[in-house]
Curated annotation (Swiss-Prot):
GO terms for cellular component: cytosol. One of its GO terms (biological process) is regulation of cell shape. This is D-alanine--D-alanine ligase B. Keywords: ATP-binding, Cell shape, Cell wall biogenesis/degradation, Cytoplasm, Ligase, Magnesium, Manganese, Metal-binding, Nucleotide-binding, Peptidoglycan synthesis.
């Protein structure tokens, strides 16, 4: 990344120009604990930078606080349902409070893995073949059509919650039942064997991709947040041409969904070198294990600069 590109990522706004900033975190989704960690890290960075910021753990009384507190803008650090799926974005639109990240439509689309895949399939970017599971017969049909191994996913969860790799019909049925406890809609996808990459985007630019390695069967919740043996490769290990191809694919994936502000795109590469899109995260993690801060460091931004850049985009996008 050039020096000019790095400088364009940084916010040039004075901290006080942001006004009073509410950091929204916590919530009631299955990703609450991750959101609490992310939100507290973001809040500390804003306060250390001199921003007039305060935190709201989004619970039963948060709407009253949003209405009663004088809030100039909101920094959304809610992961999963209720915060990353367009509902909070829609509420803030109604209250005329500018906020960070993508808007209502892009947030709702990206949170719905099935709809995201359908958009990508219509526009060309490759994404693994899949099926929707509603009963045991669907599991049997999916096994016949897609073969094994497969990966099972709740359609509206993040952080790999409820996901499982399966190698038989019995395992598939068990994984579908487990995933159904998180979501009424469950997807099963062809397993792509090969290295995994994640590509962060910030203010319209693609950050250095990260190669991921784990001794787990895939990059699951433990590997993301708890394990000490997860490997992160920056540079990502691809040659220049492949890395450029990966970055262009991530940019196309985000453009197709209508992503704004910041995001993170997850991609697999198969044995033939072909890239496959998995999903886009519109409110990625901001913990000490998180990937966007890691990519930002590789681009020359420390955590505080990253947080200010995300917040600055809310000014440009929504006033």
């Amino acid at each position: 990344m050039t020096a000019v590109a790095r400088s364009s990522l940084r916010s040039t706004l004075e901290p006080k120009s942001f006004g009073r900033v509410a950091v929204l975190f916590g919530g009631k989704s299955a990703e609450r604990e991750v959101s609490l960690n992310s939100g507290n890290a973001v809040l500390k960075a804003l306060l250390d930078a001199g921003v007039d910021a305060f935190g709201i753990d989004v619970g039963d009384d948060f709407l009253q606080r949003l209405v009663s507190e004088k809030i100039d803008r909101a920094f959304i650090v809610l992961h999963g349902r209720g915060g990353e799926d367009g509902t909070m974005q829609g509420l803030l639109e109604c209250l005329e409070i500018p906020y960070t990240g993508s808007g209502v439509l892009a947030s709702a689309l990206a949170m719905d893995k099935l709809r995201t895949k359908q958009v990508w399939q219509s526009l060309g970017p490759a994404t693994p073949l899949h099926a929707v599971l509603e009963n045991e017969n669907d599991c049997i049909c999916a096994a016949t059509e897609l073969g094994f191994p497969l990966i099972v996913k709740p359609a509206h969860e993040g952080s790999s919650i409820g996901m499982a790799k399966v190698n038989s019909v019995d395992e598939l049925i068990a994984a579908w039942k487990a995933a159904s406890t998180y979501d009424s809609q469950v997807l099963v996808e062809q397993w792509i064997q090969g290295p995994e990459f994640t590509v962060a985007s910030l203010r319209g630019q693609v950050l250095p991709p990260i190669g991921l390695g784990t001794p787990h069967s895939f990059y699951d919740y433990d590997a993301k947040y708890l394990a000490s043996d997860t490997q992160y490769r920056i540079p990502c290990g691809l040659d220049d041409a492949q890395e450029q191809q990966l970055k262009q694919l991530a940019a196309r994936a985000c453009d197709a969904i209508g992503i704004a502000g910041w995001a993170r795109t997850d991609v697999m590469q198969d044995a033939e070198g072909k890239f496959w899109l998995l999903e886009v995260n519109t409110v990625p993690g901001m913990t000490d294990h998180s990937l966007v801060p890691m990519a930002a460091r590789a681009a020359g931004l420390n955590f505080q600069q990253l947080v200010l850049a995300i917040l600055a985009d809310s000014v440009q996008a929504r006033g």
